[in-house]
Amino acid sequence: MRHKRSTRRKRASATQLYQTCKAAGTCPPDVIPKVERTTIADQILKFGSLGVFFGGLGIGTGSGTGGRTGYVPLSTRPPTASAPTSTIRPPVSVDTVGPLDSSIVSMIEETSFIESGAPAPSIPTASGFDVATSADNTPAIINVSSIGESSVQSVTTHLNPTFTEPSVLRPFSSSEASGHLIFSTPTISTHSYEDIPMDTFIVSTTSDNVTSSTPIPRPRPTARLGLYSKGTQQVKVVDPAFLTSPRRLITFDNPAFQPTEPDETLYFQHQDISPAPDPDFLDIVALHRPALTSRKGTIRFSRLGSKATMKTRSGKQIGARVHYYQDLSPIVPADSIELQPLSRPVSSASHSINDGLYDVYMDPDTPFPQPSISYSLHSPQTTNVTVPLSSGFDFPFSSTVPLQPGPDIVSPVAPTYTPFVPVIPTSPFNNVLVYGSDFILHPSYFLRRRRKRFPYFFADVRVAA
């Protein structure tokens, strides 16, 4: 069997050795100069290039290709191919700009402007009247030539529906001198659009039945806190510090720093593993703002907390949502009292106070039970008795007093039943006279006590049966 030669492991490059051994100071002597370019050859090229330039010879540490132009003799030049070139001229002649000329070149050609507005009326020119002045007191003589019939000139203007000109008011010109009157009557066409009346969609009425166009404000819907969802843990807190300073239940107090407890969300950072003062607040990273709610007849102070029980490699914290609450005071339900009407229909009548009659229901007289066996099948009855009441003295005047019927009061009546044992015996009745409070029992009623004897046996040993 042929012996297999061991393969030679390749040595690491100088750059790889330099990265690991530079800090430790264990680099071979030929690694640092090669990487930092401080060898003898590098020093010669560095200082020799200051006085000699070998740029076109292609001398360097690269591959021997002769550079970009290749190897050429020192006494000759490489041949160059000449191609006919055309003279480049600007397509448009450029005007020269003098030092005093404006450097702003207008890129927009001059266009004709159209004056907007109504057309200006043409005013005819006339020579007017010839006025002769004289210093003599002679009457003025004016020669008026007959003009003849006056001509009327009409101008018609058509409106462009796609363009509406602004209305321009121009003063009327007086042309009575020449005897010509100018009238301008634009043509008015009927419009093609539809007139729609405006309606009020939101109308509110005040207490004085005054209609206004201000919209009625609606209450903003309250957001649900989700304190009692299935994924929220419910924890009841008994410590009163939960209301004023909940930070004491999560972190330990610092005597040199006493922060205020605002009514907003509190955030906590746990750099090391340390237990909380209250075990219910372990791993709490956020404690949200408080909320007052009413549930099951109590006023409840609630805060929603977030825990960071687990932390992934990406830095995301995963934990449960906890609802911490503390009941402040119970809400006592109102007593349900049946209310009676306070007022009834009032009837007024003129009468005297002494003449008032009142109805009183009287209980019937209970008859003495007789020794007869008879069953009553009828219900008890009440009688209505009218009793006049007097105040003891009469008033000399009569007044109008409103009368209100009072409630009817029925007195309870005991049920009627027949006893099993008659109160009065049916046998011959004998009178019994009692002269004292003591009595003597007849000797025949005394029973003699007899003692019953039981045989007892005592033994110190076990007796065989």
Curated annotation (Swiss-Prot):
Protein name, as recorded: Minor capsid protein L2
Keywords recorded for this protein, A-Z: Capsid protein, Cytoplasmic inwards viral transport, Disulfide bond, DNA-binding, Host endosome, Host Golgi apparatus, Host nucleus, Host-virus interaction, Late protein, Microtubular inwards viral transport, Phosphoprotein, Viral penetration into host nucleus, Virion, Virus entry into host cell
GO biological process: microtubule-dependent intracellular transport of viral material towards nucleus; symbiont entry into host cell; viral penetration into host nucleus
Quaternary structure (record): Interacts with major capsid protein L1. Interacts with E2; this interaction inhibits E2 transcriptional activity but not the DNA replication function E2. Interacts with host GADD45GIP1. Interacts with host HSPA8; this interaction is required for L2 nuclear translocation. Interacts with host importins KPNB2 and KPNB3. Forms a complex with importin alpha2-beta1 heterodimers via interaction with the importin alpha2 adapter. Interacts with host DYNLT1; this interaction is essential for virus intracellular transport during entry.
PTM text: Highly phosphorylated.
Sequence motif: Nuclear localization signal, positions: 1-12, 447-454
Family: Belongs to the papillomaviridae L2 protein family.
InterPro entries documented for this protein: Late_L2
